[in-house]
């Protein structure tokens, strides 16, 4: 089992410093157990809050856990935006700002890309490859649509677009939901994924309330120990498995962004939500004006202020 821990964008938290402190304590408890290997994504502001809240030597222990394969820090956008909605320059800046922070705090360059909305468009293949990502996490349902299947999908697939190559790794929505809800049938669901050396990938949401975070990690350790589960980081699982196939097209409208299940692309937000469309148009207008009138350092500084 590969466990991915997710936090919503930092703008969702009213007490980010308290969230960061409890998150670090929870991660430390899980690593101290020696039983759980896991991957986690934190956006830029959360990482910065964590660096201020960390106790002495804490990040040193995290670095050691990364080296030993117990912890993987996933990469993504600094503010965790839906990248396809923004110009490629701003997309690349989001990824680079987050990458710089991971290097500063952990001394690593991330292998895996994650976005909390799980949005995907083929144009992201080139962008992520240029930013040195090896794989991206996507919804299993998106792969099922692309393959014309309804059966469970595990392992990883390759996507190719305009000569760029990337691995995509499905996150099992059904298994994630079953484990999160303490559904006793989770083992039966897992059997369909964990066959022939494959590792199922599940995504679990870290609670938004600071006081619930450490108990969440404690329950997760207990769950792994009670069921005697073998866990791997996603990066480790991907490197140990052979490809399941190749995709020429993959599209996902993602999750939790206010679109119906029938939506095919996140761009439908611009049609269904006038306020989102207005904000998007305003941002694009500012971007084009800046590109026409500013140069070099001034342009870069403006882009940073414009990052969604």
Residue positions per predicted region:
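Active-site and substrate-binding clefts of carbohydrate-active enzymes
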Residues: 1-21, 33, 153-158, 162-166, ...
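Short, well-structured secondary-structure segments
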Residues: 1-87, 111-115, 134-139, 233
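A short acidic (Asp/Glu
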Residues: 14-16, 49-54, 85-87, 117, ...
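Phosphate/oxyanion-binding active-site loops and adjacent basic polyanion-contact surfaces
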Residues: 19-20, 86-95, 171, 178-183, ...
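Alpha-helical scaffolding within the catalytic cores
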Residues: 22-26, 52-68, 147-159, 183-192
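Generic structural signal for well-ordered alpha-helices
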Residues: 24-28, 59-63, 95-102, 125, ...
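CE4/NodB-like, metal-dependent polysaccharide N-deacetylase domain
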Residues: 88-117, 189-203
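Surface-exposed loop and adjacent secondary-structure segments within mature catalytic domains
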Residues: 121-170
């Amino acid at each position: 089992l590969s466990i991915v821990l997710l936090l919503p964008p930092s703008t969702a938290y009213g007490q980010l410093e308290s969230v960061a402190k409890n998150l670090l304590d929870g991660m430390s408890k899980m690593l101290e157990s020696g039983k759980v290997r896991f991957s986690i994504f934190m956006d830029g502001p959360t990482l910065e809050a964590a660096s201020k809240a960390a106790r002495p030597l804490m990040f040193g222990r995290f670095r050691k856990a990364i080296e030993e394969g117990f912890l993987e820090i996933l990469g993504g956008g600094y503010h965790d935006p839906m990248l396809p909605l923004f110009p490629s320059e701003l997309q690349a800046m989001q990824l680079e700002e987050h990458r710089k922070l991971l290097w500063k705090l952990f001394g690593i360059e991330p292998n895996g890309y994650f976005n909390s909305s799980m949005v995907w468009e083929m144009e992201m293949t080139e962008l992520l490859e240029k930013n040195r990502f090896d794989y991206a996490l996507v919804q299993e349902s998106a792969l099922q649509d692309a393959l014309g299947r309804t059966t469970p999908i595990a392992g990883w697939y390759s996507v190719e677009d305009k000569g760029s190559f990337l691995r995509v790794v499905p996150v099992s929505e059904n298994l994630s939901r079953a484990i999160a809800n303490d559904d006793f049938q989770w083992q039966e669901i897992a059997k369909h994924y964990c066959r022939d050396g494959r590792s199922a990938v599940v995504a679990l949401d870290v609670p938004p309330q600071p006081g619930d975070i450490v108990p969440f990690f404690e329950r997760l350790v207990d769950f792994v120990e009670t069921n005697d589960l073998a866990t791997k980081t996603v990066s480790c699982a991907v490197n140990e498995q052979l490809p399941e196939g190749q995709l020429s097209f993959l599209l996902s409208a993602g999750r939790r962004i206010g679109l119906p299940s029938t939506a095919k692309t996140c761009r439908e937000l611009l049609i269904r939500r006038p306020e989102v469309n207005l904000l998007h148009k305003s941002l694009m207008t500012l971007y084009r004006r800046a590109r026409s009138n500013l140069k070099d350092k001034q342009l870069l500084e403006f882009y940073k202020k414009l990052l969604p």
